[in-house]
Design a protein with these regions (language model features):
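Conserved AAA+/SF3 P-loop NTPase catalytic/coupling segment centered on the Walker-B
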Residues: 75-101, 133-140
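Conserved catalytic/switch belt of AAA+ P-loop NTPases
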Residues: 50, 92-116
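P-loop NTPase catalytic core of nucleic-acid-dependent motor ATPases
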Residues: 1-79, 93, 144, 182, ...
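Conserved nucleotide-binding/hydrolysis micro-motifs of P-loop NTPases
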Residues: 83-84, 129-133, 149-154
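AAA+/SF3 P-loop NTPase mechanochemical coupling elements
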Residues: 67-72, 109-127
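Phosphate-sensing "switch" segment of ASCE/P-loop ATPases
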Residues: 119-121, 136-213
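Conserved nucleotide-state-sensing and coupling region of NTP-binding domains
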Residues: 27, 86, 113-116
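DNA transaction DNA-binding modules
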Residues: 34, 192-238
Length: 238
C-alpha cells in the first residue's frame, strides 16, 4: 500500500532494529482513510523492538503536555489520529512536535519535581486520517510523508480476502516463527546511508502535496490568479 516509499520505511525500521538507541532526526508520517492498516504496521514494529520499549497509542496532547513523562525510556512511538489543522494555531503546534522528533536532549518537568534533562532516543511514526494534518512549508525537514491512496474497500480486500491480515496477526504472537523470520529479515537489510537518518527527511511527491494543502487559502488564490494572468496580476505583455 505504501508503494515506492516503502524503501525508505524499510530502512527506517531496519535502523531501529540494528542500532537501538540511535536517534533518527525525522519521523515517518502516514495518512490514509480510516482502516488503512496503519495499526497493523505499528503493532509489528512494536513486536520486533519489544513492546516494553514502545508506545503505539500516543496522542499530540500527551507529547506536549508540561508534565508528560511518556518519552522516558521510549525507543519507538506512534502518534495517532494527528490533526493539527483542527487546532487554533497549527503552525505553532507543528513546531512543538518538531522539537520532540528531532532534538537529542529534552527538558521535562515531572509533576512536583524540578526540571531535568533526558536523552531522547525515541523515533516516531505519525498516523492521521487527514492529509492536511500538519503545517508544512517547502523547507520543512523533519517529516517523511506517505499518503496511502487506496480506498478502504481495496485495503480491506487485500488484508482480509488475500490473507495478509492473518499473516500479520500470526506474526504478532510472542516468539512466533513468522516474527523471528521478520526480525531476521530486518537485521539483514543493508542500510545504504547511515547519515541519512541525521539529515533532512527525504522529500516525496506526497510531501509537496501536503505543503500545498498547508498554504492558506488566500495564498493559493493569489498564486492561481498570478499564473493565470488574472486580476490583480493581469498583464498585456508590457
Amino acid at each position: 500500500f505504501i508503494g515506492k516509499n516503502w524503501k525508505i520505511v524499510e530502512q527506517f525500521i531496519a535502523m531501529m532494529i540494528q542500532h537501538p538507541g540511535v536517534k533518527i532526526r525525522w519521523a515517518c508520517v502516514f495518512t490514509s482513510v480510516e482502516g488503512g492498516g496503519k495499526g497493523l504496521l505499528a503493532s509489528l514494529v512494536s513486536a520486533l523492538l519489544g513492546h516494553h520499549n514502545c508506545n503505539t497509542q500516543l496522542n499530540f496532547d500527551q507529547m506536549v503536555s508540561k508534565h508528560s513523562n511518556v518519552l522516558l525510556g521510549l525507543q519507538f512511538g506512534v502518534i495517532n489520529e494527528l490533526d493539527l489543522s483542527s487546532k487554533k494555531n497549527i503552525k505553532s503546534n507543528t513546531n512543538q512536535l518538531k522539537k520532540i522528533i528531532s532534538d537529542p536532549i529534552l527538558t521535562i518537568e515531572l509533576k512536583n519535581k524540578p526540571q531535568i534533562k533526558i536523552p531522547n532516543f525515541a523515533n516516531f511514526f505519525i498516523y492521521s486520517n487527514d492529509d492536511d494534518c500538519l503545517y508544512l512549508t517547502k523547507e520543512a525537514r523533519r517529516y517523511f510523508i506517505t499518503t496511502i491512496k487506496h480506498e478502504q474497500a481495496m485495503i480491506e480486500k487485500r488484508l482480509e480476502e488475500e490473507g495478509y491480515k492473518d499473516l500479520i496477526v500470526d506474526a504478532l504472537e510472542y516468539n512466533s516463527d513468522q516474527l523471528c523470520y521478520l526480525k531476521d529479515y530486518f537485521e539483514n537489510v543493508v542500510i545504504e546511508d547511515h547519515k541519512m537518518f541525521q539529515k533532512n527527511a527525504p522529500k516525496t511527491e506526497d510531501f509537496y502535496d501536503l505543503v500545498e494543502k498547508s498554504r492558506q487559502g488566500i495564498h493559493r488564490t493569489l498564486d492561481d490568479r498570478f499564473y493565470s494572468n488574472q486580476y490583480p496580476f493581469e498583464s498585456n505583455g508590457e
